[in-house]
Amino acid sequence: MSTFDATRRASKISVVGAGSVGSSLAYACLIRGSAGLVSLYDIAKDKVEAEVADLAHGTQFTPASVMGGADVHDTADSDVVFITAGARQKPGQTRLDLAGVNANILRSLMPQLVEQSPNALFVLVTNPCDVLTVVAQEATGLPANRVFSTGTMLDTSRLRWLIRQWANVEQRHVHATIVGEHGDSEFPLWSTANISGVPIRDWAVDGNRVFTEDVLADLAHEAAYAAYKIIEGKGATNYAIGLTGARLAEALLRPGRSVLPLSSVMTDMHGISGVALSMPCIVSRDGIEGVVPVAMDTEEIASLKASAERLHDTLSSIA
């Protein structure tokens, strides 16, 4: 048995919130075997019990088991706790529009979760995840390495998929990252983006540049606003964020380190402090070990500061 297999069998992930996002996250963790035990918790008793039963009926075919219910004790002794509970983003709403109501939910919820799992890592998925990461840290007093959010991890995956489609290459060759707010002010780090080591602005086919400035602008916009289109069409985004959370859980539970774009509370990052926003982070069993000092050009640093200012304003409005 490998070290990861042994760790996985002994580990527990809890997902708080049995809505479309939480249930999809629990399902993704279950079928991938992200941990040995997946627990789903929600105060809506009938809903969560139905979701748990539906998941449990298929565990003959999964490498993990599932439990859960409407008692917060179902989350006890978790290694990683994902928070997906909160008001759902409606068509036309920005993520920041949800800040006030979801912040109040979180201030009540977080102390209960920490009491059940005092040594856990806590991952915010509920939007606006950057703002709520600050709220969650303040509500618990936990260090920033243990309270963070999925941030732009999904946005980065969206961007890489779009680049892959445009360049007609395998996605594993695409290296590009979105940073800043998980929301309208996010932006790609085009200055370091590349395809198999070739700067993205230099990628050419038959001598013609594939990624002109107009193309890059369109791709950035499409990645940032993809969720709005999905919400308009089906009411929620759930499958991709479920897979995102499962992948993050594995990075937090397995030996070794990963580099992922996550949102954590910044301390003097390009002069930014007191807000959570996404940067490439070193991730391990200890949570976020540090922020990667990725190279950024002058325009990108200005965009990061503008994104931080936007988040500062929202935090001030719900203080």
Swiss-Prot record:
Nuclease is among the record's keywords: no
A GO CC term attached to the entry: cytoplasm
Compartments in which it is found: Cytoplasm
Reactions listed under catalytic activity: (S)-lactate + NAD(+) = pyruvate + NADH + H(+)
Activity regulation as described: Allosterically activated by fructose 1,6-bisphosphate (FBP).
Phosphotyrosine PTM sites in chain numbering: 228
Sample GO molecular function, one term: L-lactate dehydrogenase activity
Amino acids binding substrate: 89, 95, 127-130, 155-158, 237
Gene Ontology terms describing biological process: glycolytic process; lactate metabolic process
Pfam families reported in the protein's UniProt record: Ldh_1_C, Ldh_1_N
CDD domains: LDH_2 (cd05292)
Subunit structure: Homotetramer.
Protein name (database record): L-lactate dehydrogenase
Source organism per UniProt: Cutibacterium acnes (strain DSM 16379 / KPA171202) (Propionibacterium acnes)
Name of the coding gene: ldh
